[in-house]
C-alpha cells in the first residue's frame, strides 16, 4: 500500500495586478474576453530586478498563475455549480474553472502590451484582457508559446453546449461622458458580456458594479442592457 503523500510547498507572491475591478462583480468570466481592459502588474520588492523579465518583451502574451484571493475557503467540495450551466447543474470541480478549489489558484492568458521600468517600483508589466480583481496576488509569470499552448482541435466539454452571451449596450451620452475616455471601451466590453449572475433575469432589477472608481448602475431587458446612472465613488 502506498504511503499517503504529505508533500506541500510554499508559494511566494511575486507581484500584484492592479485592475479596474475593486470587487468580483463585473469581472469577465475568462481572460481575453475584453481585450481593452488594461492592467498593471507590479512586482513585490524581492522580485523587482529588471533582469528577471529580460526577453519577456519579445512575447505578445503571457500566462499568469494567481490566487483567487476573494474566494479562499478552508474546505472544498468535489462538485461545483458552473455559472454557464445556470448555477443548478453540478460538475466535478476539476472539470471547471470554479474558484472554490482545493488550491485556490487561477490561470489566465493575457496580452503583454509593454514593459515599463519605473524608478520607484522597477519593471511594470502593462497587460490587456485580464480577468482579475484589483490587488490579486500573482505567483508566477510565464510566456505564452503559440506552438505549444494553442490547441485549435481541443474539445470544449460542457462549455460547447453553452453560448457566449452578448448584450446591446445603451446609455445616455450625458452619462457616458462621466466615464474617462481611456476607460470607455473597457466598460462597454464588460457590460456587453452581461456581468449579472447567470441566475438573475429580472428586467426591473437595477444592478450596480464598481469600475475604475465609478459606480455604474444598469438594467437588462431581453438582449439590451441600459445604463441608468454613473457616479464617481
Describe the predicted segments one by one.
Residues 110-113:
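Conserved positions in beta-strands of structured domains
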Amino acid at each position: 500500500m502506498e504511503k499517503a503523500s504529505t508533500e506541500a510547498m510554499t508559494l511566494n507572491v511575486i507581484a500584484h495586478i492592479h485592475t479596474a475591478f475593486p470587487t468580483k462583480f463585473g469581472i469577465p468570466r475568462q481572460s481575453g474576453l475584453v481585450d481593452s481592459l488594461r492592467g498593471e502588474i507590479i512586482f513585490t520588492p524581492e522580485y523587482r530586478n529588471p533582469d528577471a523579465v529580460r526577453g519577456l518583451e519579445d512575447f505578445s502574451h503571457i500566462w499568469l498563475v494567481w490566487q483567487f484571493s476573494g474566494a479562499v475557503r478552508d474546505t472544498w467540495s468535489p462538485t461545483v455549480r458552473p455559472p454557464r450551466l445556470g448555477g443548478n447543474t453540478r460538475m466535478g470541480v476539476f472539470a471547471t474553472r470554479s474558484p472554490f478549489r482545493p488550491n485556490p489558484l487561477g490561470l489566465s492568458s493575457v496580452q503583454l502590451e509593454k514593459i515599463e521600468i519605473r524608478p520607484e517600483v522597477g519593471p511594470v508589466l502593462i497587460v490587456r484582457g485580464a480577468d482579475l480583481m484589483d490587488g490579486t496576488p500573482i505567483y508566477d509569470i510565464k510566456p505564452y508559446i503559440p506552438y505549444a499552448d494553442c490547441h485549435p482541435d481541443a474539445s470544449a466539454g460542457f462549455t460547447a453546449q453553452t453560448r457566449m452571451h452578448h448584450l446591446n449596450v445603451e446609455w445616455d451620452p450625458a452619462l457616458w461622458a462621466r466615464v474617462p475616455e481611456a476607460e470607455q471601451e473597457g466598460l462597454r466590453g464588460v457590460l456587453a458580456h452581461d456581468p449579472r449572475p447567470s441566475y438573475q433575469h429580472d428586467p426591473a432589477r437595477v444592478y450596480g458594479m464598481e469600475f475604475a472608481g465609478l459606480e455604474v448602475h444598469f438594467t437588462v431587458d431581453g438582449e439590451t442592457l441600459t445604463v441608468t446612472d454613473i457616479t464617481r465613488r
